């Protein structure tokens, strides 16, 4: 079935164009900053810069989080934009997604450069609590809260996309073009490729976000209540 397409006065389908442009600009700035971080670490490894080991690993932690975060942010924004050309999405959901993402970034940067958190990729239980005195538990908690805030934002975005696609194409199978794929529907009734991709991404990402959030919350509880074992 055909879904409603939202268009601007000029006739071009551009839902929340301003929000999308702002997000892509922010992602570009962060990506450039991560390149600077990467170059700084390489110069330190080559002996050109003299960085204290704790600062090196703080930069490494920020670099890893920033690169993954930038990839996720741009990917979700692009998916939102092209999905919005086929179904009317609620602009407030995207702003909530962006706000939670930025809040998470603030938490993560504060945990790293104010709290000294330098766990890099080893931020899951039980490693955040085993710092060797390099950072306090609150820094690890703040870091994990940052990831949790970002995850909640992504979950809101995916739920909005999934809700609208399911409603427009009569269910998950319809949005995935299964009736057409299995010979029960007409090719002309198949959803656009962007819709199929968005529905598939929404399913897998939603599952991953929920599981990941559960692990993060369990780790936070362990940091606050050490007797609690995950």
Locations of regions flagged by a protein language model:
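Hydrophobic alpha-helical transmembrane segments of multi-pass integral membrane proteins
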Residues: 1-230
């Amino acid at each position: 079935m055909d879904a409603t397409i939202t268009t601007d006065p000029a006739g071009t389908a551009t839902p929340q164009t301003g929000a999308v442009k702002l997000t892509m600009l922010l992602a570009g700035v962060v990506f450039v900053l991560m390149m600077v971080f990467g170059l700084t670490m390489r110069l330190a490894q080559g002996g050109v810069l003299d960085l204290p080991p704790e600062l090196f690993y703080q930069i490494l932690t920020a670099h890893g989080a920033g690169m993954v975060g930038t990839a996720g942010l741009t990917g979700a924004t692009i998916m939102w934009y092209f999905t919005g050309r086929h179904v009317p999405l609620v602009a407030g959901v995207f702003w909530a997604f962006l706000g939670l993402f930025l809040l998470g970034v603030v938490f993560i940067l504060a945990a790293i450069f104010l709290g000294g958190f330098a766990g890099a990729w080893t931020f899951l239980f039980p490693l955040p609590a085993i710092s060797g005195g390099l950072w306090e538990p609150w820094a690890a908690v703040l870091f994990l809260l940052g990831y949790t805030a970002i995850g909640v934002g992504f979950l809101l975005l995916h739920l909005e996309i999934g809700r609208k696609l399911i409603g427009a194409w009569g269910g998950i199978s319809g949005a995935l073009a299964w009736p057409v794929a299995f010979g029960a529907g007409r090719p002309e009734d198949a959803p656009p490729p962007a819709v199929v991709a968005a529905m598939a991404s929404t399913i897998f990402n939603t599952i991953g976000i929920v599981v990941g959030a559960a692990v993060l919350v369990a780790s936070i509880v362990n940091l606050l209540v050490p007797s609690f074992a995950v």
